[in-house]
Each structure stands twice: as C-alpha cells, then as structure tokens.
C-alpha cells in the first residue's frame, strides 16, 4: 500500500543528504502509476481527461478532491476506494502534482544528455567518436556488436551500409551489426567497468605521448564514475520514459473555448504518436527502411522532450517559438532552480511608497492602517474571539470588514511588540532588510526613519518598499534581536557606522556649529552652559555668536586641530574652570549629547558626525549611541529649518581671477604648440602637456572659486548657501560646484580620450552651442554606462555569493600557527591606510612587544582599537595576524582566524555566514561604483600625473640601491629601476621612502640634509626614456631606414623623427651602441641598448653623447579617463583569475640578467642564480625589456612591460604573495572610488579561489590525473595512503576564478542552481553524487533551515523558554521586545531572552 498524502509531508523533512543517479528502467516503472498510451489530453466536450491519455485520471489521480471521475463515489468516507466503473482512486486532487506515469518505448532511445553533452559519456565508454556515435544512433551507420570469428572486425567498429552488405556476402551469419540505440545498448551491456578501469590504468602507465595520456585520463574519468557509483552503463539508453505529473504541465482553459497548454504536452504527444506508429509498423512487419525511419523520428522526439535543440533542429510550436523541454524548465533565471526554489513569493507581505518620517525613533517605522489591518488579520481575528467580541471566525471577519471601532483598538494591541520587516529592492547587502516596530499612520505611505536611508539606499522620489511579517515566536525574536534597525548601526563591510546623519541633518549641524563674527553679543563670557541657554532665550545672543565659556571637564578641541573632523584620534584635553572660545550653537549641540561625552568644540561636517557616532559607540555602547542619533537627527532638522537656507543665482560666485587664469593658460598652450612645431616634443607629449595645463587651470579656478564663496561677504554676515552645502558634505561636491560657477573643464570623447579644448564656461554663464555639444557625449555615456554596469555588478555579486555561500564560522579555534604579515599601505610615500586601521579587530599570531620589551598584545588576543593605537605608537612596522587565508578549518573558518564581526564590534560568533557577508560587502559598492560617472556629468577628471617628489619632513637623504651618473649639466640621474630614496632622522630611522624611477633627476646627494617640502626627485611623467650610462659615439645597429625604423614627417611641424617599427625580418634586433671615446676595439666596450617598437629616437648615427643623455623616448598612454570603467571590469578580471592580455614574463629565481639571441621572432633572456641555476625566457620581439644586461633581479620581478599574471605569481612566489597581490589590487580599485571595504572580506573570497589542488601524479590514491580537488580533501586522502604505506599523490596549488570555483563545489545542487545546469546534473548523475547539504543554498532549495546563524546544529537545541507554559485565563501581555529605553535591547549574544511568554504572539 502506498503511503497516503498525509504521511508524506513528514517523510520529506527528515533526511540528511540527497543522492542523484541514473534511473534503471525497473526504477522508472516502479515510480509509475500506469502507462500512457494515447496522445489525447481531455475531451473537448466534457473537459474530462481521456482515459490512458496524458491527463488520465486513472493513472494520475482525480481532478476533484475525494471524488472519482464518473461521480459514483464522493466525499471523504470513501477515501482510498478505487472506483469499479472508471478505475479512479478516491483521494486528494493534489496527488496529480506528484504521481508519475510512463511510456514504454517500442525501440530503445539514447538519452541526449549522456550522448551529446560534452564530453560524450557514451562515446567515452565505448571509445567511439561523437560523429560516429551520432551516425549509429540516427540510423546512418551500423556498429559491430559481435564480431564473430575470423572476420577481422572488432567490437564497436562503425561501418557504413555498403560495407555491411559487402561483409554479409563475405561472412554470412558470422557477425552481428546493429543500428540505432539498440546496438549501442548491446555494446554498453557488454562493458565490464572494473576490468576496463584496470586496463586503462595499465595503458596510462606505459603510454609515452602526452596527448594519448590525456585522452586516457578523460576516458578513465567516465569509467571510474560508473565504477564507483554503481550505475549501469546501459541505463544511459532508455527503454521507458517517465511522464511527469499533469499538474506540472497544465492545460488551462482560456476564455473563448481555447486552451493554453504547456510545451511539454506537445513534446509528449509527439513521442506517444511516433511510438504508437512504430508499434503498428513492427506488428505489420513493414519494410526495414520505413521502420528505421520511424525509429529515428522516435529518437528525435525523445531528444526534443529531454533537451530541445541540443541535437538537430529545434522543434518549434505554433507561433514559431522553440518549445520548452524538460531541461529548459530547470535552466536559467526562469528555470525551476532560480525562479521557484531560490526565489519564492511569500504571503503576509505588502508593498507601498515610502515617505520620510522625521519624528520616528530609530527602531520605528510608520505602517498605514489599511495595510496593518490586512497583514495582521489572523492575529486580529484571534484576539477578537479571545476578548469575546465575537464567537466565530466568520463574525470576526464581518467586524473587520465593517471596520468596527473595536477593531482599531485591537489592531493597536496586536501590533504592539510585533516587529515587522522592511525590504527595499535591490537588496544588495543584509542591511537591505531590517526589522522595525510599526507605528500606525493615516494615509497609504510607509514612513521611514531618515537615518536608515543610507543602509537601504532609499530616497523619497517614489521608491517603494515591501513589508513582511515574521509569524512564529522564534521568527519574531530573531527579527527583534538580530534585525532591529537600532541593533544594526555598524556596516558589516567596514565596521564604521552606517546610520550617520546625511543631507539636511548635516546641514543643520554645520549651521549650528558655525561661528559668525559680528553677531549680537559677540565676545561675552559665560559661567556655565545653562547661562548661555538662558541668554539665548532672552535674545541677548544669537545661535552663531562666538562667546567665551568657563568649562570644567574633557574637551575635544577641533578648532586647534584646524577643524579636522578627526574626533576619534584627537586627544581630549582636561579643562578645570578654564575659558574656551566657542559659540552658542556648539553649546546647544553639546547639551544634547550623552552625559559623559567630552565637549566637542569645532565645526562639525559630515565626516565629523560619522566619527562622533563611532566614538560614542566605542565609548558608551549601542544603547547610548542610538539615543544620541535620534537627538542629532532632531537637532539637525530643527536648525536646517531655522537657518532658512535657500539658493539664488548670485550665490554661484564666479571668481574674478578666472578670466586671467584662462588667458594665461591659452598663452601656455600656444607655447607648447610652438615647441611641437619646432619638433622639440612629440605629438603625444604635446597632447599630454596641453591636457596637463588645462587640468591645472581648472583646479586653480575651482580653488579660487571656493575661496571666493567662503569669503562671500555681501551683507557683512552672509553665509553662502552653496558653499555651506558642499563644505558640510550635505549635498554636492567640489566638482559639481566647479561646474556651476568655476569652469566645466575638460570633457571626454565617447572613446574615452579627452578633448584638448576644455569648456571654459560654467553653468551660470551658460554654454554656447559647441560647448553644449561637447557636453552631450559625457552625459549620454554616463547614462549608458549606468544601465550596463548595474547588470554587470549584480552578476558579480551573484558569482561572489555562490563561491562563498558555504563559508560559515564553524569552530572556535582551528589551531593553526600560520598567519600573514600586515603593513601600512604606502603609495608614493604617503600613508594611505595606517597600520592601526588594518589590524584592528584581528587576532594577533605572536606577541607584539614595544622597544622596551613589554608585551602590548599577546598570542591569540584580539587587537582592539586601543591596542592597535598602542602598537602604532610603539613604532612597530608590521604585525603578524591570523587570517582566513591560513585557517585550517576543513569546512568554513574559525573564530580566531576571522576575528571581529564588523557589524557588532565584538569577536564573531559560531554560525555567522561570513562568506555571504563578504560577497555582499564586495558586491554592494560595485553597484554604487557603476553609478559614479553619472552624477558629475561626464567631465573628465584625470589623476594628474606626478612629476616630482618632495620630502614630507626634515631629515637626511639616503640612497638605497640607487646608481647614478652625472649628465653634462652636472645633474645626477638615476640609472636603475629598483632604487629607493629614503629620508631618515638623525638616529638613522627611516621616515619616508620613495621609488627613484629610471631616468629621474636626483636633486639631493646621498647623506645630504633635507628640509620638508624640498624636492628630492623629478621625472617626466609622460614618456619613458632610454638613457646612456657612458659618454661616447652612437652607432646604429640593425636600425635600417624603411626596415626597422621609419622617418616620420610631422605634417604640422615639418620636422622629421625616427620611429622604430616592427620589422618583418626576424633576425634583426634594432639597437643603439654607445662606444666610449678612445675605445678602438670593436665590440666589448660598447654599451648596447635595445630599441623597442614605437620608440622615438632622439639621436642620430655617429652623434657624440654625454652619459645621462636620452637615446630614445617611448610615449606613455596616460590620458584615458580613470573612471570605475577601469574599475568594475578590473575587479571581475581579478576575481575570475583571468590571464591579462600581453602579460609580463616574470623572473622565477633571484639572479643576474644575461641577454641571449633572437630565435623565431623571440628574444631569449637568461637569469642566472647564485648557485648556477639558469632559467631562460623567450620575450616577444619589439617589447620594451625592463632589465639591463648584468642587472640583478628578484624572483617575481617582471622582465618586460605589462600586467602580471596572477597564476605566475602563485607559481613563483607562492600562495601568500598571490593573496596579498589579489587583496591589494582589488582594494586599489575600490580605494580610487573612495569605497572602504575591510580586507577580511576579500580574504574570504580569495580563500575560496585558492583552496584547489591539481593532481599531477596520482601515486596510490583514488584521484584521477589532472583532477582538480579541494586541498583539504587532497591532504586527507594523502594521509590515508601514507598510513597504509602507499605513495601519496603530488599536486600543485591552483587558482580558480570564482565561476570555476563555484562549479567545482561538492554540492551538485548548489552548482546546478548557479550555471550550466544540465552539465552539472549530467556529471552528478553519472557519478551518483551525494549532496550532504552543508552550504546555505542547497538547504534553501531543499526547503530546510539554513545551517548558519540560529539554524546551525550548535544552536538547534536552544528552545524558547515558556513554550510549554499552560496559559492562565487572564495573562497580562508580556513584552517580548521590551521598551525602547530598557537595557534589554542590547545585542543578541547567543542565547535567547528568558522571560518570553506566548501571550502577545500568534498561537
């Protein structure tokens, strides 16, 4: 007896893993409830399903609940009876969603996935090529099944029709040849997987050719999968095909008597028709040709049913649209996985437009009464009955529909302490869904607290948000402890506050803390803050009046620190009845700050407010901070209103110096043009210089404009509103204001190059037609980019989530002794990110001691803010910390290696889904970045190329590996690449270091004293020069006019220049030799300089030179705008571990460079190590070689120009270096955009990319050659083999891109729902893979709790206290979510609150 539909629900939930494998014909028949033999669907008159048809009720179940088809048995009492008239079982109609049927095929058919999916599984097993196999299956050729004796044939050989006839005459009846899937099935039956596996392994041992070895390896992979999984090869050929339940391929009546049907029905009908016709033909003993043709048609119909379009022509429906086959229902965004299993719709939800709710508290949101009434209906009904307002649900319904006054009171009660979740699409990170306490509001719009807008990325120009209601008590508790907006004030991406005042609030606070000299009551002295406030009320002083105040307590004085906004790192000063210069507004602000907060004296801008929030969080915790945020919000709005700021056209002050600056620039441009005319500079240099001139002028004009606005003093006490907005950080940036009232500056062409004539006008003066036209490019490009990049960025996030979704904090300490070193990030001498900021929240791997030897941080201790500051103060250069990269946890990572959970500021807890958090933190700004170009309106902003380096502090110059020569002018010129100019103090400690680039002028001698701002080095940023190290005479070698060099006449200047070109003759190596004077002998004394393609020669043959003179210049490409366009694709390139085009070849060992000869158009270069080891590299001709002969290089240094390939870095320098490279490169892109992401997120992703090993020598392990396996698996297997005394496998570390890594995961469900669904499932089925459901995605798909957070095994035992309490008749409602100001609203720490009653919840 089959289990009834009731018990089935329970069966489903209770399993630990899921296995996929091939189904045998017996298995398919055992699933089936009957054979479908007729292609009919339903009767057109009665609309009842036809018997034995595709919708047959006898096979699939009744169409009405508890009712057989003919109506003889109705109602529940006949449950389980099978009707004697129509043969239908009396049961629920929903069994039509789960009962399968089957079709017995008259002739076997191959399964298209296994025959056609690459690599062809059937082909590999039989060792038949795909083309031959196809010919056999589609009845164009015969295959020998039994070669017989003495025929000279071999089993599995494919022969043509003629050859078969010929053989039939030669050896009648001796051999058997067959056509179609039958033949293939016979062959597959004969295969003995065990012996075949042995045979191939033997062959591989003896095989010499690499090609054949690979072929065997591929074949072995398929054979092994059958051997291990217990699947039988002949199951890849189908005798029976299952018919999926009719409700999953419904036939829906449309109005007008037509029907809309699922494509699957068409495909099944086709199979049934052809199958029935074939049966008849076989019965009639029709001619072979006809039967064969019918079999081929059947095979094609079955192929189309499983995967339409995989082989042959696509079957199309009535309107020429390809039919959706079974494979298509799984694939892609609209397929089963992504549409129905990963993205379900939920009830108890609603959506509406949002408006701002400035009077709400941070944990509240306004919910329209109408919505609340609908969403909380069941709760209201329950409460109405409970209170005795009605006795049945029906009455309750009526009360609610009539909107009886009592209903509103009850709604208030129900809503109290019942959190709701708000979500704004797109949900780019976890803060896109937060929980709030609802406050009922009139109208139809949801009200939102202004401080959570940043997290939701919401504005009020018509955005909509969705509301969801957590129903179960557990869900409510989780929502209110983990997701409440007041508990999420830190960003998981960087650990800084995310609920920071923006826009109006910033403006209000800026205005409030500004001082305006000359205001009423200026300079008065007050004894206390209270006196100040009284004086303000009396009208003696104004808000912006500067005053003196006598104060006792701590003061953070930003005024003395020149209004830096650095609240966190400014030392508070202790005042004891001392006088301080402040303003009335600042007194008001400080009056509203928390009790023990130091007095903050200074002008607060956006950054200052952000730091204030962080300071408060660090010092006083969450509770106080939330309270303060609401205070600041109210103050900000109040004073933004009181300030009455408004913009007029006169506020766009055009600086008086503008005209002069533009005139000067035009003169400079003329000078440059003249230089170009005289041939002193190349075309590229001219372009670069002009761009440079205009960039500088634009900068100058905008600086002048800002000063003019700041000092804009029309009425004696006027504050320029535009300046206030930009300066405070409320709205608008320097660039935008520059366009309003400075000059628009340089614009970019659609190709990305910069147009050299800038727009000198601004929007206030207005643009002329040409200027307007030039502007349109940028504006359009901005819009197009936005649309395209949003999609790209979303796809990147999806891949990141997929690769890291199963990284969960799994244990407290993995016990590793490995770690990574962290240093401050320094670019061109400036500290971009201090050591302090990089190590905070990580766990130390070794004791960190100061110079006296006192331990600052011990082993495995978390580095807090204070400790990090102490380490930096002690002058420690680098710190070794634990990192996700070196974590030894087999699954997930451990607490100690991950460190602090950035969203709480405490150590991370077990069960935290850090992989998903990492993916979201990296993906979310991606979308922000894509929008970046859009706002500025496409004005070209170039990073001005640096051309000199000045010292930041006083000290002494020290050369580190700089080799110099003196030029004829007597200047020192750096002649090597990796030299460094350092500035040291009198004790010889390094304070700054700068790279001395090749060809730079070194302006200070070694050891000379240096003043701060003194220029140390100068160089030409636009060209790369090749210089001579010796004085002497120039000899051209292989520089032949018209062959390897060309004299290019410049039309504009009439000057000619020699340019090296790529010559077709491979033997020639263009080079310049400089022979010192007096050297008579040929050869040896001459210095050789190779000339790369496109070099402009600056000397002529036979000319005399002095050391340090320029031989040739290579123009640099610098003038493309640096926009995130370089950004997003670059990030994707790094995450996908793609090889960059034209990668630089890097040295694999430390050693000395020797030049070799040129062969086959490639130049050989040797690196000789100290120990005599020699490596040779072939560099393409015409590239610029970075190293001179005899120069020393380190392993990993590039030998030529070009980007480095991450795979090379892994091979040469190892995993840690590669990881450092990846993290730094990706960070650089984000840093350019001013996006702050914590390193540990990037580390989490790169760990997933680097956990793979490629097996090179299998030893005695179970691995297959060239297989890519998880390194933990690799290690375990090797240990197992070693214990047994076998030979372990050898492998090399691999770097997989995120897509590849996602598809290599253990879980086939997760991989199939990501990409290439059919390929993944084919592979999994043949291997008989088992999915142990360890990641998040698999569990969501299977409809289980995710194994992270509270769903983790570790927390599953936690029960809600009070679940089995017997309810007293009148229990007062207990609060689950205590009031706003009580201590309980602290962070959720692992257990759950104890005192929860069930009263106020849904039972």
From Swiss-Prot:
Could you give the subunit structure recorded for this chain?
The RNAP catalytic core consists of 2 alpha, 1 beta, 1 beta' and 1 omega subunit. When a sigma factor is associated with the core the holoenzyme is formed, which can initiate transcription.
Record protein name field: DNA-directed RNA polymerase subunit beta'
Q: Name one GO biological process term.
A: DNA-templated transcription
Gene3D superfamilies with a match to the protein in the record: 1.10.132.30, 1.10.150.390, 1.10.1790.20, 1.10.40.90, 2.40.40.20, 2.40.50.100, RNA polymerase II, clamp domain (4.10.860.120), RNA polymerase Rpb1, domain 3 (1.10.274.100)
What does the protein in this record do? DNA-dependent RNA polymerase catalyzes the transcription of DNA into RNA using the four ribonucleoside triphosphates as substrates.
UniProt keyword terms in alphabetical order:
DNA-directed RNA polymerase, Magnesium, Metal-binding, Nucleotidyltransferase, Transcription, Transferase, Zinc
Reactions catalysed: RNA(n) + a ribonucleoside 5'-triphosphate = RNA(n+1) + diphosphate
Q: Where does Zn(2+) 2 bind?
A: 814, 887, 894, 897
**Cofactors per UniProt?**
Mg(2+); Zn(2+)
Instruction: Kindly indicate where the leader peptide sits in this chain.
Output: none
Please name one Pfam family that this protein belongs to: RNA_pol_Rpb1_3
Its lineage reads: Bacteria, Pseudomonadati, Acidobacteriota, Terriglobia, Bryobacterales
Q: Cofactor comment in the record? A: Binds 1 Mg(2+) ion per subunit. Binds 2 Zn(2+) ions per subunit.
- GO terms for MF: DNA binding; DNA-directed RNA polymerase activity; magnesium ion binding; zinc ion binding
* The keyword Disulfide bond is assigned to this record: no
**What EC identifiers does the entry list?**
2.7.7.6
Record-linked InterPro entries: DNA-dir_RpoC_beta_prime (IPR045867), DNA-dir_RpoC_beta_prime_bact (IPR012754), RNA_pol_asu (IPR000722), RNA_pol_N (IPR006592), RNA_pol_Rpb1_1 (IPR007080), RNA_pol_Rpb1_3 (IPR007066), RNA_pol_Rpb1_3_sf (IPR042102), RNA_pol_Rpb1_4 (IPR007083)
Q: Which residues form a coiled coil?
A: none
């Amino acid at each position: 007896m089959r289990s009834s539909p009731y018990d089935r629900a329970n069966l489903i939930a209770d399993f630990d893993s899921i296995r996929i494998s091939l189904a045998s014909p017996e298995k398919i028949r055992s699933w089936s409830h009957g054979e479908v033999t007729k292609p009919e669907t339903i009767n057109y008159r009665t609309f009842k399903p036809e018997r034995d048809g595709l919708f047959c009720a006898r096979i699939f179940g009744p169409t009405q609940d508890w009712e057989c088809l003919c109506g003889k048995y109705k109602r529940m009492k006949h449950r389980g009876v099978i009707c004697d008239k129509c043969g239908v079982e009396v049961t629920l109609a929903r069994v039509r969603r789960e009962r399968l049927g089957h079709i017995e095929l008259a002739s076997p058919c191959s399964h298209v996935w296994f025959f056609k999916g690459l690599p062809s599984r059937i082909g590999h097993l039989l060792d038949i090529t795909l083309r031959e196999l196809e010919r056999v299956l589609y009845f164009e050729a015969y295959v020998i099944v039994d070669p017989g004796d003495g025929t000279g044939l071999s089993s599995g050989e494919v022969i043509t029709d003629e050859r078969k006839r010929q053989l039939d005459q030669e050896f009648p009846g001796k051999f058997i040849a067959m056509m179609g899937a039958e033949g293939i099935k016979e062959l597959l039956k004969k295969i003995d997987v065990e012996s075949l596996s042995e045979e191939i392994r033997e062959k591989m041992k003896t095989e010499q050719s690499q090609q054949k070895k690979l072929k065997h390896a591929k074949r072995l992979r398929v054979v092994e999968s059958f051997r291990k999984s217990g699947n039988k090869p002949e199951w890849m050929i189908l005798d029976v095909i299952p018919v999926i339940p009719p409700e999953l391929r419904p036939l829906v009546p449309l109005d007008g008597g037509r029907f809309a049907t699922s494509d699957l029905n068409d495909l099944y009908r086709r199979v049934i028709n052809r199958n029935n016709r074939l049966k008849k033909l076989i019965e009639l003993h029709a001619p072979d040709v006809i039967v064969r043709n019918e079999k081929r048609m059947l095979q094609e119909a079955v192929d189309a049913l499983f995967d339409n379009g995989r082989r042959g022509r696509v079957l199309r429906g009535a309107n020429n649209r390809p039919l959706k086959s079974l494979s298509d229902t799984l694939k892609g965004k609209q397929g089963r996985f992504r549409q129905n299993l990963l993205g379900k719709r939920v009830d108890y939800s609603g959506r509406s437009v949002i408006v701002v709710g400035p009077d709400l508290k941070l944990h509240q949101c306004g919910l329209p009464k109408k919505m609340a009434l609908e969403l909380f209906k069941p709760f209201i009904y329950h409460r109405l009955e409970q209170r005795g307002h009605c006795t049945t649900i029906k009455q309750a319904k009526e009360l609610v529909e009539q909107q009886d006054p009592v209903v509103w009171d009850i709604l208030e009660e129900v809503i109290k302490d019942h959190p709701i979740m708000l979500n704004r699409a797109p949900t780019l990170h976890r803060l896109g869904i937060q929980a709030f306490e609802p406050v009922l509001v009139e109208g139809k719009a949801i009200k939102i607290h202004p401080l959570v807008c940043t997290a939701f990325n919401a504005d009020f120009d018509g955005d909509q948000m969705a509301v969801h209601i957590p129903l179960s008590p557990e869900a409510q508790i989780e929502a209110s402890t983990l997701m409440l907006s007041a508990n999420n004030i830190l960003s998981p991406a960087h650990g800084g506050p995310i609920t920071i005042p923006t826009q109006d609030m910033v403006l209000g606070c800026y205005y409030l803390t500004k001082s305006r000299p000359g205001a009423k009551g200026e300079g008065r002295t007050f004894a206390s803050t209270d006196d100040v406030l009284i004086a303000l009320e009396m009208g003696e002083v104004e808000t912006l009046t500067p005053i003196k105040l006598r104060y006792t307590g701590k003061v953070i004085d930003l005024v003395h620190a020149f209004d830096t906004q650095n609240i966190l790192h400014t030392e508070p000063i202790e005042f004891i009845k001392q006088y301080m210069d402040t303003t009335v507004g600042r007194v008001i602000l400080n009056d509203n700050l928390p009790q023990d907060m130091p007095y903050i004296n200074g002008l607060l801008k956006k950054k200052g407010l952000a730091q204030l929030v962080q300071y408060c969080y660090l010092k006083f915790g969450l509770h106080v901070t939330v309270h303060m945020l609401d205070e600041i919000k109210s103050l900000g709005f109040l004073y933004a209103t009181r300030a009455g700021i408004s913009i007029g056209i006169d506020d766009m002050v055009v600086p008086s110096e503008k005209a002069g600056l533009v005139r000067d620039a035009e003169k400079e441009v003329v000078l440059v043009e003249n230089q170009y005319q005289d041939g002193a500079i190349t075309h590229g240099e001219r372009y670069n210089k002009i761009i440079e001139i205009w960039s500088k002028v634009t900068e100058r004009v905008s600086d002048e404009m800002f000063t003019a606005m700041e000092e804009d003093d029309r009425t004696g006490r006027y504050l320029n509103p535009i300046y206030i907005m930009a300066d405070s950080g409320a709205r608008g940036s320097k660039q935008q204001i520059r366009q309003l009232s400075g000059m628009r500056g340089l614009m970019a062409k659609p190709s990305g190059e910069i147009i050299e004539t800038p727009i000198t006008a601004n929007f206030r003066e207005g643009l002329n037609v040409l200027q307007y036209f030039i502007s349109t490019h940028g504006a359009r490009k901005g819009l197009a980019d936005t649309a395209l990049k949003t999609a790209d960025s979303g796809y990147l996030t999806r891949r990141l989530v997929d690769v890291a979704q199963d990284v969960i904090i799994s244990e407290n300490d993995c016990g590793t002794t490995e770690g990574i070193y962290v240093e401050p990030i320094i670019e061109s001498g400036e500290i971009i990110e201090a050591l302090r900021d990089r190590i905070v929240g990580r766990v130390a791997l070794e004791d960190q001691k100061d110079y006296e030897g006192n331990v600052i941080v011990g082993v495995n201790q978390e580095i807090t803010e204070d400790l990090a500051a102490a380490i930096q103060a002690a002058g420690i250069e680098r710190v070794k910390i634990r990192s996700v990269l070196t974590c030894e946890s087999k699954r997930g990572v451990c607490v100690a290696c991950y460190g602090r959970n950035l969203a709480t500021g405490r150590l991370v807890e077990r069960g935290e889904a850090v992989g998903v958090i990492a993916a979201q933190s990296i993906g979310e700004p991606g979308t922000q970045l894509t929008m970046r170009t859009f706002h500025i309106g496409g004005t070209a902003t170039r990073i001005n190329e640096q051309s000199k380096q000045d010292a930041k502090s006083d000290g002494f110059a020290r050369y580190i590996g700089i080799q110099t020569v003196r030029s004829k002018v007597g200047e020192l010129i750096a002649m090597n690449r990796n030299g460094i100019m350092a500035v040291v103090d009198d004790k010889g400690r390094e304070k700054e270091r700068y790279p001395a680039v090749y060809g730079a002028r070194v302006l200070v001698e070694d050891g000379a004293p240096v003043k701060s701002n003194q220029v140390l080095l100068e160089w030409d940023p636009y060209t790369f020069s090749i210089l001579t190290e010796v004085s002497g005479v120039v000899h051209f070698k292989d520089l032949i006019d018209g062959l390897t060099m060309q004299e290019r006449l410049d039309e504009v200047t009439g000057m000619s220049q020699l340019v090296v070109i790529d010559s077709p003759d491979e033997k020639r190596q263009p080079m310049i030799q400089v022979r010192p004077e007096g050297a008579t002998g040929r050869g040896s004394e001459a210095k050789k300089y190779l000339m790369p393609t496109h070099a402009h020669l600056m000397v002529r043959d036979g000319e005399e030179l002095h050391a340090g003179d320029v031989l040739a210049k290579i123009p640099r490409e610098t003038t493309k705008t640096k926009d995130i366009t370089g950004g997003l694709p670059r990030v994707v390139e790094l995450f996908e571990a793609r090889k960059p085009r034209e990668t630089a070849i890097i040295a694999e060992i430390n050693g000395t460079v020797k030049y070799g000869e040129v062969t086959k158009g490639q130049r050989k270069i040797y690196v000789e190590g100290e120990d005599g080891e020699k490596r040779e590299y072939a560099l393409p001709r015409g590239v610029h070689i970075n190293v001179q002969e005899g120069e020393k290089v380190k392993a990993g240094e590039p030998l030529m120009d070009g980007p480095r390939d991450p795979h090379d870095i892994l091979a040469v320098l190892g995993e840690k270096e590669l990881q450092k490279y990846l993290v730094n490169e990706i960070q650089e892109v984000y840093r350019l955009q001013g996006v702050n992401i914590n390193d540990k997120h990037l580390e989490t992703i790169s760990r997933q990319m680097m956990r793979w090993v490629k097996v090179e020598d299998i030893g005695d392990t179970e691995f297959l050659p060239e297989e890519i396996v998880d390194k933990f698996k690799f290690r375990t297997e090797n240990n197992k083999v070693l214990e047994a005394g076998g030979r372990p496998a050898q492998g090399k570390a691999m770097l997989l891109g995120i897509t590849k890594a996602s598809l290599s995961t253990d879980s086939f469900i997760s991989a199939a729902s990501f990409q290439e669904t059919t390929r993944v499932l084919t592979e999994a089925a043949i291997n008989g893979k088992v999915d142990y459901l360890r990641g998040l995605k698999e569990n969501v798909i299977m409809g289980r709790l995710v194994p992270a957070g509270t769903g983790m095994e570790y927390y599953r035992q936690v029960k809600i206290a009070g679940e089995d309490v017997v309810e007293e008749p009148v229990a007062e409602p207990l609060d689950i979510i205590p009031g706003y100001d009580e201590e309980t609203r602290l962070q959720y720490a692992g257990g759950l609150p104890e005192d929860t009653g069930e009263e106020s919840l849904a039972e």
